[in-house]
Amino acid sequence: MTDAPIISPLDQARILSEALPHMQRYDEETIVIKYGGHAMGAEDDAKAFARDIVLLEQTAVNPVVVHGGGPQIATMLKRLGIKSEFAAGLRITDGATIEIVEMVLAGSINKQLVGYINEAGGKAVGLCGKDGNMVTASKATRTMVDPDSRIEEVVDLGFVGEPEKVDLTLLNQLIGHELIPVLAPLATSSSGQTFNVNADTFAGAVAGALKAKRLLLLTDVPGVLDQTKKLIPELSIKDARKLIADGTISGGMIPKVETCIYALEQGVEGVVILDGKVPHAVLLELFTNQGTGTLIHK
C-alpha cells in the first residue's frame, strides 16, 4: 500500500473553498444514496463510506441510504446449500430464500452499516420497507423468450416485488429529527407478504416519493459507457432512451437507467450512476466541480 499524497495547507483550503458553493446548493436538501453490495468491498471501505455519510449530515444535507447485498446473500445461500437462480437480472426468491434474504439484508448488512455510521459520529436508524408499512409492493413479473420455441413466457420470480406505494410518515420524522435512515430493500404486500425488491428500484421509489435533490446509484462500474467504453458524463432522458434503443446501454445497465428515468419523472432533480469503489465517491460527486459518474437529468 502506498502512502497517501501529502496535501499542503493551502491546497486543503482550496479544496474546502471549492466545496462551499456545492454545500450551499445542497443545504437542507435530501439526497438518496443507493449503496450496492458490490460497492461495499472491505470493512475499511464501508467505514469510509459511513464517514462520508456523516459528513453530509454535518453539512446540513439530509442523506437517506438504501443498501443492497447481492454478493452477501449469495455467500449465505451457498453456505446453507440453497441454490439460487436468476431470471431477467432478478433473483428468483422462493420461501426458503426470502427468509435468508431478509436475515442478511435487514439483520446483518443493515445493522452493520448503521453501526459504522454511528461509530463515525452520526445517528443512524436501520429500517426496511416493512417498518411502518413504509414501502408496499406487489409481486413482480417478467417475461422471457424461450430460446427453443421463441415463445414469450411469463417467469415466476417468487417473492420478488415491485414498489407500489411509499409512505413517507416514518422517513419524514427521522429526517426532521436529524437522524440518518438506512433502509434495507424489503417491502410488504397489502396482505403482509414479504417481498425482496431490487435495491436500485427501491431507492428510485423512495427518492421519487421524497422528491429528492439527487439520487446516487453507487455500483461497480464508472457510470454509463459509450460504445468505445468511455464514460458518458451527462445524459438527458431523451439521450438515455436513444442509447437503450441502439444497444449502447445494455444488460444490467438498462434497469438502472430505467430507474433513473422513473425517479426523474417522479420529481427527483438529478440522478447519478457512479462507481462506489472509488474512494469518497459521494463527496466527489456532490462537492467538487468535476463530479464523477454519469448524471442523468430531464
Swiss-Prot record:
Q: A Gene Ontology molecular-function term?
A: ATP binding
What pathway, per the record?
Amino-acid biosynthesis; L-arginine biosynthesis; N(2)-acetyl-L-ornithine from L-glutamate: step 2/4
Checking Pfam families in the record gives: AA_kinase
Gene Ontology cellular-component terms for this entry are: cytoplasm
Catalytic activity, EC: 2.7.2.8
What biological-process GO terms show up in the record?
A: arginine biosynthetic process via ornithine; L-arginine biosynthetic process
Report the superkingdom from the record. Bacteria
Subcellular location(s): the record lists: Cytoplasm
Q: Which Gene3D superfamilies match?
A: Acetylglutamate kinase-like (3.40.1160.10)
Query: Which protein family is named in the record?
Result: Belongs to the acetylglutamate kinase family. ArgB subfamily.
> Which annotated residues bind substrate?
69-70, 91, 196
Q: Where is the signal peptide?
A: none
Which HAMAP family has this protein been placed in? ArgB
Q: What role does it play?
A: Catalyzes the ATP-dependent phosphorylation of N-acetyl-L-glutamate.
Instruction: Name the enzyme's class.
Output: transferase
**Is Nucleotide-binding one of the keywords?**
yes
What are the top taxonomic ranks of the organism? Answer: Bacteria, Pseudomonadati, Pseudomonadota, Alphaproteobacteria, Hyphomicrobiales
For the site labelled Transition state stabilizer, the residues are 34, 256
**Name assigned to this protein:** Acetylglutamate kinase
Report the NCBIfam families cross-referenced here: argB
Keywords, sorted A to Z: Amino-acid biosynthesis, Arginine biosynthesis, ATP-binding, Cytoplasm, Kinase, Nucleotide-binding, Transferase
